[in-house]
């Protein structure tokens, strides 16, 4: 039995369906990320789980307790759920210590000790407990918000895009630190984000939301390498989608014969490769006289961005499945290491590693 069960959840705002039949199971102590474009319903779902609003239809069950069943709902303060918002939502007139201990009873003899302990757990020095929120950095404020949420010993932690306002480097380190803290505490966690890389790196389970319901739920690896459809493939990362015919575990495509993840046979199909599966090796036009199954291209664009370089490669020879000519005239967009990326005008040999995914 799942720790959190969501079944058939619906929510309307007037004629607009914010949620249109959401189902989700979350295991105890796990981390789940809900990712999707703005307006897809992910924040509405978080508000219903937290108890800030009630669903029109559907059930929410947490650790065997029914929190919501249609319009009947347990109040937010009785759910045992912690929430960390995007801006931290700290009280500006309170000290950091009082922010962390806001939900604790004033008469608790161990209140001060617990506040110091929580500050230590989230990586804050006790010296800052007498400061005000405006005296802290964005990363420190988010740690305070997390400590405040953990102070109530929640059964479930909800993170509503808590890292989006942080600088890129700090965002990555904070995400890793928060994941480790929550895992060590054994707290089941749901992260809502519009950042695909954040969702894939943070969670053991990722749910892609579109138009008020989940399009696909699974492990980060399965969603990235075996997306259900083209929309999910392109939403989760750069995608190379090619026409192909499938037979005997291989695809005949504009990039040649490529191993695929199915043994089905199809005359017409679409396959997915990720740009990192395409290898490049410098050569010359004279070096293009290899075996017939070799594929060559010319670099037509190169955009340096430090550690990475985005390059466009126009195929110079391609194979002959349907639409091959059109694909041959469309450059492949690839990301390679910025240290030794080929320059515009260079000739490269292309190779494919791993298997391509065949869309169902």
UniProtKB/Swiss-Prot annotation:
PROSITE patterns: ABC_TRANSPORTER_1, ABC_TRANSPORTER_2, FBPC. Residues 4-236 form the ABC transporter domain. CDD domains: ABC_Carb_Solutes_like. Pfam families: ABC_tran. GO terms for molecular function: ABC-type ferric iron transporter activity; ATP binding; ATP hydrolysis activity. It is found in: Cell inner membrane. InterPro entries: AAA+_ATPase (IPR003593), ABC_SmlMolc_Importer (IPR050093), ABC_transporter-like_ATP-bd (IPR003439), ABC_transporter-like_CS (IPR017871), ABC_transpr_FbpC (IPR015853), P-loop_NTPase (IPR027417). ATP binds at residues 36-43. It is a peripheral membrane protein. GO terms for cellular component: plasma membrane. It comes from the Bacteria. Its EC number is 7.2.2.7. Part of the ABC transporter complex FbpABC involved in Fe(3+) ions import. Responsible for energy coupling to the transport system. The complex is composed of two ATP-binding proteins (FbpC), two transmembrane proteins (FbpB) and a solute-binding protein (FbpA). Belongs to the ABC transporter superfamily. Fe(3+) ion importer (TC 3.A.1.10) family. This is Fe(3+) ions import ATP-binding protein FbpC. The lineage of its organism: Bacteria, Pseudomonadati, Pseudomonadota, Alphaproteobacteria, Hyphomicrobiales. The gene is fbpC.
